């Protein structure tokens, strides 16, 4: 049977793949989307971003954490949370998001093929269908986008055959909330899950080979988050690693650490990074290669070494975020078909970390600016100085703005606290438009809102700058 002809084949229906498919379809192209699982959305929607953030909100709701912060007392009624309570809302949100993405693909006329895609040659992809067994469909296109995402790494030291030893994908299938949990890896995923389970009253041990929490963050945010996590009861094991893990059928799982310490816990969650399965695509038949980590090298347009084959998302490595993957997919599709609608990634890419408390940032940290030789002034506003912050009971959150000292142009925004991942967008848009301190002073924010923190932090920066440059008074138009 001859191959079905398309303008574009996309392999992988995560954020990057769906964005590429939708964009090409909107450009009037015939698009085929290949997805090995039954659900559209990839890891972001089905096992990663959306599920974990939904679980976080559920954990906060049923644990009474927010109520304790607001009223200063424990007003929670339910003392024992069941795993069904934790997962019910997650299942609904995940299914709804996946369905919505599929509905849009159908509306755009994208042909979706269920199965595993492999290259037969640089322009042909064979789809092996799960049902009926042995069924295949060959697809052919002038342009191809690879967006197969990533999978959790599984270090050999951990017995994943045990139902109580999980990677970050499998955690969604736990059958009971453990009394104690060891989280291996204090990266973004490990830290988020550690906070979530600690909120539910689980004794959490967080083990990491580094000596600092999320060192890519502004140090003030990293230190504040570490303090908050320790107050939740999370125990950190820094500069350490697991050398042995024994998981009997019953009883506690035993961990032996390189430091000589031993831990006994109910469950283990391994968050040791993610890797790609790009080698399973038979890339050699298409003419491009992969790195030892399974990543696909690309240029600034997300082209592989084969000019008509693109790769986006986790399969190309950092930053491996759902938001940036979608951006990459749009850029790749536009470049493939000569459209100028989206020629490059956004200049500034925000990061959101859904720990408890939430953390978000965009742009330069104070240290990064200084490394670039830029003299800076930093303004800070604490949530407990803001009426909205007081109303919601957030006593530890803060907003930190990094300005260029010379002209007070905004260079970076760093937030920790309630709604941090939303609040950062005010600064993000200001940076996208080249905004400076005057923008925030000229803006009228609703009252009371956390957005007003921008005005307070800007005042702080202006006063500090006045002290630095020796001015007793600073006029509104003379920054």
What are these regions (language model features)?
Residues 2-6, 23-29, 35-177, 210-214, ...:
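Glycine-rich flavin
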Residues 2-14, 177-187:
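Beta1/beta-strand and adjacent pyrophosphate-binding region of the FAD-binding site
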Residues 9-11, 117, 138-149, 183-184, ...:
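Short hydrophobic core segments
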Residues 9-37, 43, 50, 54-61, ...:
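Flexible, glycine-rich terminal cap/loop adjacent to redox cofactors
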Residues 16-23, 43, 165, 190-193, ...:
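Short glycine/serine/threonine-rich phosphate/pyrophosphate-binding segments
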Residues 49, 148-203, 207, 235-236, ...:
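Glycine-rich dinucleotide-binding loop and its adjacent helix/turn
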Residues 76, 99, 111-114, 118-132, ...:
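A Rossmann-like FAD-binding core segment of flavoenzymes
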Residues 161-178, 262-340, 422, 426, ...:
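FAD-site-proximal beta/loop scaffold in flavoenzymes
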């Amino acid at each position: 049977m001859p191959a079905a002809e398309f303008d574009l084949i996309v392999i992988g229906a995560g954020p990057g793949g769906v964005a590429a498919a939708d964009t090409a379809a909107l450009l009037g192209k015939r698009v085929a989307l290949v997805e090995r699982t039954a659900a559209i959305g990839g890891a972001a929607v089905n096992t990663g971003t959306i599920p974990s953030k939904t679980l976080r909100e559920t954990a906060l709701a049923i644990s009474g954490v927010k109520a304790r912060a607001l009223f200063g007392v424990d007003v929670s009624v339910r003392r024992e949370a069941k795993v069904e309570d934790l997962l019910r809302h997650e299942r609904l949100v995940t299914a709804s998001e996946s369905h919505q993405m599929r509905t849009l693909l159908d509306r755009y006329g994208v042909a979706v093929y269920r199965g595993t895609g492999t290259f037969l040659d640089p322009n042909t992809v064979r789809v092996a269908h799960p049902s009926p067994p042995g069924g295949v469909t060959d697809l052919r296109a002038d342009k191809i986008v690879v967006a197969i995402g990533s999978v959790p790494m599984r270090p050999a030291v951990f017995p994943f055959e045990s139902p109580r030893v999980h990677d970050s994908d499998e955690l969604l299938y736990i059958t009971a909330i453990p009394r104690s949990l060891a989280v291996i890896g204090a990266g973004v995923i490990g830290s988020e899950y550690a906070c979530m389970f600690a909120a539910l009253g689980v004794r959490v041990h967080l083990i990491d080979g580094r000596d600092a929490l999320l060192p890519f963050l502004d140090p003030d945010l990293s230190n504040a988050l570490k303090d908050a996590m320790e107050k939740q009861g999370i125990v950190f094991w820094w500069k350490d690693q697991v050398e042995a893990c024994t998981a009997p059928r019953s009883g506690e799982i035993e961990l032996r650490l390189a430091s000589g310490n031993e831990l006994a816990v109910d469950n283990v969650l391994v968050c040791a990074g993610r890797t790609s399965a790009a080698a399973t695509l038979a890339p050699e038949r298409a003419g491009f290669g992969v790195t030892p980590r399974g990543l696909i090298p690309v240029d600034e347009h997300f082209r592989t070494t084969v000019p008509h084959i693109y790769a986006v998302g986790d399969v190309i490595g950092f930053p491996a975020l759902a938001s940036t993957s979608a951006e990459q997919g749009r850029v790749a599709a536009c470049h493939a078909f000569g459209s100028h609608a989206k020629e490059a990634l956004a200049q500034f890419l925000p990061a959101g970390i859904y720990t408890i408390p939430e953390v978000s940032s965009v742009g330069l940290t104070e240290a990064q600016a200084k490394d670039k030789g830029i003299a800076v002034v930093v303004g800070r506003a604490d949530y407990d100085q803001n009426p909205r912050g007081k109303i919601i009971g957030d006593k530890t959150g803060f907003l930190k703005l990094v300005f260029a000292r010379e002209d007070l142009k905004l260079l970076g925004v760093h937030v920790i606290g309630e709604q941090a991942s939303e609040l950062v967008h005010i600064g993000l848009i200001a940076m996208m438009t080249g905004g400076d301190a005057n923008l925030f002073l000229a803006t009228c924010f609703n009252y009371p809102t956390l957005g007003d923190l921008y005005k307070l932090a800007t005042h702080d920066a202006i006063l500090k700058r006045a002290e630095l440059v020796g001015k007793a008074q600073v006029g509104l138009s003379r920054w």
